């Protein structure tokens, strides 16, 4: 059965986290807590610079970069914990948002059902109207046949009286 388009249709680009693939989840989580990926990149940069310093034999610079790594890793961990705390405090707010979205979806479904029922009523009204016109046409046809018969009867009387 083909789907009837409706004025209530619209595309929902919002996906549930469980429906997302790996890259979409990664981007979604990075947008939720932007400091964590930045901290990870900075920590990785500090490790790379420390490794280069160790290879070149510069122990003092390597030590500084390893200290930076520890500091950046700690900052990333703090950002992660703070973000999860903030994110969990917004959980109740998100729940109400989700409930509003569910209510909106139910409302859209109700409107869609009402629109389908309205269309069905219109179709039924057209069907009844067409049937009524067919009956009237049949009645008119029968009436015209009766009039033709009466006319023939009158013509035969007129011809008989001449």
UniProtKB/Swiss-Prot annotation:
Where is the HIG1 domain positioned along the sequence?
7-98
One GO biological process term is: mitochondrial respirasome assembly
Segments passing through the bilayer: 35-54, 64-86
The keyword Ribosomal protein is annotated on this UniProt entry: no
Any Pfam family: HIG_1_N
Family annotation (InterPro entries): Hypoxia_induced_domain, RCF1
Note the subunit structure. Associates with the respiratory chain complex III/complex IV supercomplex.
How is this protein named in the record? Respiratory supercomplex factor 1, mitochondrial
Q: Which organism is it from?
A: Vanderwaltozyma polyspora (strain ATCC 22028 / DSM 70294 / BCRC 21397 / CBS 2163 / NBRC 10782 / NRRL Y-8283 / UCD 57-17) (Kluyveromyces polysporus)
